[in-house]
Amino acid sequence: MNIKQIVQGVGTQLRSLAMVFSHSFRPRDTLCYPEEKVPLAPRYRGRIVLTRDPDGDERCVACNLCAVACPVGCISLQKAERVDGRWYPEFFRINFSRCIFCGLCEEACPTTAIQLTPDFEMGEYRRQDLVYEKEDLLISGPGKYPDYNFYRVSGMSIDGKPKGSAQKEAAPIDVKSILP
């Protein structure tokens, strides 16, 4: 060994020590998770919920678009019809052990019934506990869109009311009268 190699080795050791000491006084990148909350991105896609209208009815009309859009097929539902003609899901089931939280179900939903929340703490010990039913998914509020009501916006007729008589609804147009 010559002097050049010894000086180079000592310099390498001193540089390593300086790097360790410089990192000792910096803020840590690691968070103690349960005590310190993890900062989430503004558009983080977490747990899926079903929302309600401003009137309190559930928004889902059981159109099955969310189940068709789901790439892993973790959503299943069965359509039923109320006395007034409005559709609703008789059962709505999401298997979160298969869900990849892609958000395609939220994009496909015409009524904004399905919404993804920033909640990510869904760990369970048994796989069966990750299958959520409609009662587990329904929340009491309207979610991200508080004033949206599908039946008011879409212009669907309500049984017992003539067309054009609802609030902010234009009178129906007779298309045969405007034909050439």
UniProtKB/Swiss-Prot annotation:
EC number(s) reported in the record: 7.1.1.-
Any GO CC annotation of this UniProt entry: plasma membrane
Renumbered residue ranges of the record's region Disordered: 160-180
Name this protein carries in UniProt: NADH-quinone oxidoreductase subunit I
Gene coding for it: nuoI
Catalytic reactions on record: a quinone + NADH + 5 H(+)(in) = a quinol + NAD(+) + 4 H(+)(out)
Cited function: NDH-1 shuttles electrons from NADH, via FMN and iron-sulfur (Fe-S) centers, to quinones in the respiratory chain. The immediate electron acceptor for the enzyme in this species is believed to be ubiquinone. Couples the redox reaction to proton translocation (for every two electrons transferred, four hydrogen ions are translocated across the cytoplasmic membrane), and thus conserves the redox energy in a proton gradient.
Annotated Gene3D superfamilies: 3.30.70.3270
Domain 4Fe-4S ferredoxin-type: 48-80, 90-119
